[in-house]
Amino acid sequence: MQIGVEAQRAVENRRVFVLDEDEITRTVLQFMLADDNETHEFATIDAALEKGLDWQPDLVLLSAAFVIRDGAELLHNLRSAWPGVKLLVICEADDAAGVAAVMAIGADDTLTRPFKVEPVRRKIDRHLGRKVELKIPVVVS
């Protein structure tokens, strides 16, 4: 059992692929997600597709650079290879045009840099169909 992880989450471990040419980005996201998810990182689409033949991911975090280079065809190919997969594209927070473009060609959502642990985990949990705890401050007067 994983330390600090609820028993139910340990049982329902989901598979997440992180695809980015940048090693630091891959490592950071794997570190953030590894407690609650079976997380694999890849520098190339081909490496991820090969691994995905035997171990289909539930969710893919995909560098915007891959999407810009290969366009909607890439998203279509990933969905064909892995039916039901959720595709989230990693974008820069200040790139509103890039975010709009990847959403227009079929991404399920975006994950924006800079990354913060709790927002990243909440977004991933939401797309994996897990209950997301709302933290609403209550003021008693």
Write out the residue ranges for each language-model feature:
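Acidic, metal-coordinating helix/loop segments flanking the phosphotransfer/catalytic sites
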Residues: 43-59, 63
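C-terminal output helix
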Residues: 97, 115-124
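Conserved acidic segment of CheY-like receiver
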Residues: 12-24, 29-33, 59-61
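Conserved phosphotransfer cores of two-component systems
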Residues: 53-55, 77-84, 105
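Conserved phosphotransfer microenvironments
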Residues: 58-78
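Alpha4 helix (beta4-alpha4-beta5 surface) of REC/receiver domains from two-component response regulators
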Residues: 73, 93-109
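CheY-like receiver
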Residues: 2-12, 129-141
